[in-house]
A protein has these predicted regions:
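Active-site core segments that coordinate phosphate-bearing ligands/cofactors
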Residues: 3-5, 17, 107, 111-169, ...
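Short loop/turn motifs at secondary-structure junctions
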Residues: 69-72, 204, 384, 400
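N-terminal glycine/serine-rich phosphate-binding loop of ATP-dependent small-molecule kinases
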Residues: 1-96, 151, 223-224, 228-233, ...
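Short beta-strand-loop/turn "lid" adjacent to the catalytic site in phosphate-handling enzymes
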Residues: 44, 62-101, 127-132, 159, ...
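Structural signal for short hydrophobic segments within the conserved structured cores
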Residues: 26-29, 206, 465
């Protein structure tokens, strides 16, 4: 008996197959071989075609099915890039490309809504400003593409769209409503006042399900095309960051997870609804939330994380080095990169900077001393500095990151990055044998009742490595961090 996990990223789509009795991943497929394109028709825009995601979901399932018959699949879980807008016609066709998470076009619309609804009311009820989230993106479509808006039957998130393609049912989740800024935390219900402010008909908002539990069943078309038996439950759905926390068994108040993909995230669980007055970090409904046992996730997002490292590889390393070689060369430079700084904020508006687009930068280059190796190290340190910057904000909300859990993937594959982050934050970093697709598969098995308890679901989760702070590097990194903060403040003033 198997569980299928699907991870819709912005760079790739991964599909993993979990053997439920052993808890082991028996197969996985990641597509495409190169990164999926992100279309940017204007500065600050970012779009992807939902049909592209669905294409690569099918490709991955077919690749796995060569050796593992899909008739063995007993549950399906989906995780996805958060906040993206998918607008569907009554026939279920996408009416435009998805405006994805790193698109900044709706920042001004969100700011207008915050002032009109009232900052205090928003922070009390939605725990966030409307910002650049999904509802604001839809309001942009209403204002700028009225002919498309008029045809919208339902709007949803990227993972909701994949669930629809598998089942024929248009739905979202309560956690999903919260990431769209359409959840009222105080009243424990949909935040219709946000939709009303934007002129969004309530009928456009899909029904919302729990994240862990049966939400829909696959249809006959999925069985014909992919071999997954009709009636297979879709029993888990979560945005990539709540899912990353779930994958690491970060479910209780005080526990903290991190990831370093295209964007970087620190996600801390609390049982008390808390809001940052400046909305630099955001609070969402966690996957195991219930009214009687509330669980919320405070999310710090740095848009320019893995994408910064990827840019450095393309434009500095000239793609002659893989990431492992880049890490080795970067490690040849001392902590602090001998004064060279990289500011990684070049992938849209950064919430942690008050929704500003400051741009990225390489600062303090000494033409007589600094080399490619310095730039490689400074890039990873700059990303770690941005994590520290946000974690200091989270500390102000009562979270204390003494231990940070992460999957051994993406930037956390870099010994230099994880060592730098541990030293800067003073936290122990624990690395585990999991990823988003595998976590979604585990969640689906739990949601379908194939695992009876959380303890059973996570029995096979293994800690692979522990990274402790390095005292000898602390002074150099603290000095680098202070200089980096000064540069960020200068960029904020000029933005």
């Amino acid at each position: 008996m198997k569980s299928l996990g699907i991870d819709i990223g912005s760079s790739s789509v991964k599909v993993s197959l979990l053997d439920i009795p052993t808890g082991e991943c028996v197969a996985s497929a990641t597509n495409p071989a190169a990164e999926m394109p992100i279309e940017a028709l204007r500065s600050g825009w970012a779009e992807q075609d939902p049909e592209m995601w669905w294409h690569y979901v099918r490709e991955g399932i077919r690749q796995i099915a060569v050796k593992h018959p899909m008739r063995e699949v007993a549950a399906i879980g989906i995780t996805y890039q958060m906040h993206g807008l998918v607008a569907l016609s009554e026939e279920g066709e996408p009416l435009r490309k998805s405006i994805i998470w790193c698109d900044s076009r709706a920042v001004g619309i969100g700011a207008e809504a915050l002032e009109e609804i009232g900052r205090e009311f928003c922070l009390e009820h939605t725990l966030n400003s409307p910002g650049n989230f999904t509802a604001s993106k839809l309001a942009w479509v209403k204002r700028n593409e009225p002919e498309i808006f008029a045809k919208i039957h339902k709007f949803m998130l990227p993972g909701d769209y994949i669930a629809y393609r598998l089942s024929g049912r248009m739905s979202t989740s309560i956690s999903g409503l919260s990431e769209q800024i359409l959840w009222d935390f105080k009243e424990e219900r949909r935040a219709d006042f946000v939709a009303d402010r934007y002129g969004i008909p309530h009928a456009m908002i899909p029904d919302a399900d729990v994240s862990i539990g049966i939400q829909a069943h696959t249809d006959a078309a999925t069985e014909r095309e992919l071999g997954i038996p009709a009636g297979t439950p879709i029993s888990y759905r979560a945005g990539d960051q709540p899912n990353n926390a779930f994958s690491l068994n970060v479910m209780e108040a005080g526990e903290i997870a991190a990831t370093g993909g295209t964007s970087g995230v620190v996600y801390g669980v609390t049982d008390t609804p808390k809001a940052d007055p400046q909305s630099r970090v955001n609070t969402f409904v966690h996957v195991n939330h219930t009214p009687g046992k509330p669980r919320y996730g405070i999310l710090l997002c740095i848009n320019g994380t893995g994408i910064m490292n990827s840019w450095i590889r393309r434009n500095v390393a000239q793609q002659t080095m893989d990431y492992a070689e880049m890490n080795r060369l970067a490690a040849s430079v001392p902590a602090g990169s001998e004064g060279l700084l990289v500011v990684p904020f070049g992938n849209g508006a950064e919430r942690v900077l008050g929704n500003r687009c400051t741009g990225a930068g390489i600062v303090n280059i000494d033409l007589n001393r600094h080399t490619t190796a310095h730039i490689l190290r400074a890039a990873q340190e700059g990303i770690a500095y941005s994590f520290r910057y946000g974690i200091d904000i989270m500390r102000g909300l009562g979270l204390s990151p003494d231990i940070i859990r992460a999957g051994q993937a993406n930037l956390f594959l870099s010994p230099l990055f994880r060592q730098t982050l541990a030293t800067l934050t003073g936290a122990r970093i624990e690395l585990f044998n999991t990823d988003g697709a595998l976590g979604a598969a585990r969640g689906a098995a739990l949601g379908a009742g194939l695992y009876k308890t959380r303890e059973e679901a996570f029995a096979s989760l293994r800690r692979l490595e522990v990274v402790e702070p390095v005292a000898a590097d602390r002074e150099a990194l603290e000095a680098g961090y202070r200089a980096w903060v000064a540069e960020v403040e200068r960029k904020i003033q000029n933005s």
